[in-house]
Amino acid sequence: MTQAAAPAAHSSFYMAMRILPATRREAMFALYGFCRAVDDIADERGPATASQRLAELDRWRADVAGMFAGRAPTRLAALDQARRDFDLKQKDLDAVIDGMAMDAAEDIRAPDWATLDLYCDRVASAVGRLSVRIFGLAPEPGDALAHHLGRALQLTNILRDIDEDAAAGRLYLPREALAAAGVT
């Protein structure tokens, strides 16, 4: 198992990623490792305070910028190879960090639809845009697939995790939908 594969080994995605051709597989392992690392910062496994979590996400943002400037830090070596092999976009990696920052800054409670859509784009559709490049889809249909599938999967996750999120002080259901259902 490669170093990039290690974080994915305990994921439900691991077996699916293993069947990809080697270059695509290593790129997906690297992308998964990046997403897992920044997600861990934003949730309960991350630093204790919001300011500490945001500072750590800023370090990741600086490392991503350095990678695109030709100065990839060691922790992004595998992702840098994926970036070069598959033309991954900095804006999508930054969007993932921005989504985690939305979680890290404060507990999300009943955002409006626009904020929820932005959150879904950042934490799910951006990952989809990176993934479809690795899978080799053409940009236009690939980005459309990432847009819709990312949102569908993230909304499904929100519904699946509603109890867990509530225990953590988070509520991702949009306030307009709650109001329409008579929930205040």
Language-model segments: residues:
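Acidic catalytic motifs of isoprenoid enzymes
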Residues: 1-184
